[in-house]
Amino acid sequence: ASDVYKRQRMIFVTDMDVDDVSYREVVEELTELYGKRIAPLHFPIREDGKFVGYVNVVKQAGRRYIDKAGKEECPVPDYLTEYLEKYHETLMESVAETSEEFMDRYFEGDTFSVAEISAAIATNVQDGSIVPVCMGSPVNLRGVSNLLDDICGYFPSPSGRSCNGIAQKTNEIFEANYD
């Protein structure tokens, strides 16, 4: 339906607090289904099977949860650097495809700033060329603020979109106003 109606989309993988949930397997399955459009923006940090933090692919940085609402910076664990490199490279390929200038810079081995990456993600989400993947545990309020931040940062405002309806009694077409 998102392709038919030209709607942007994002995938949020839940239950990261459950021991046997594998975020990497979900991302691999999504990639098999949708190809290179899948772009993981975060992935979990686990210790002793527990969901204790996440890696931000855009910023290439780790965050550890310190309580229900707080988090602090932490190094990316060694066992996750391979996945960070893989997901970051996939994201950089998507960023490069945003413009000729970015494509040239990518092939010259140049790096992109966080602001450039974020702007390119927003452009690619809006045209449907990538589908961001986030994760968390809504039950424990982990990852939900990242999801909301990503929606606000990468998706177009609904106020910039017109929507028409048909009045049931008169069959007249009208423009819906969200204000």
Task: Say what each PLM segment does.
Residues S2-D179:
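Structural and coupling elements of P-loop NTPases
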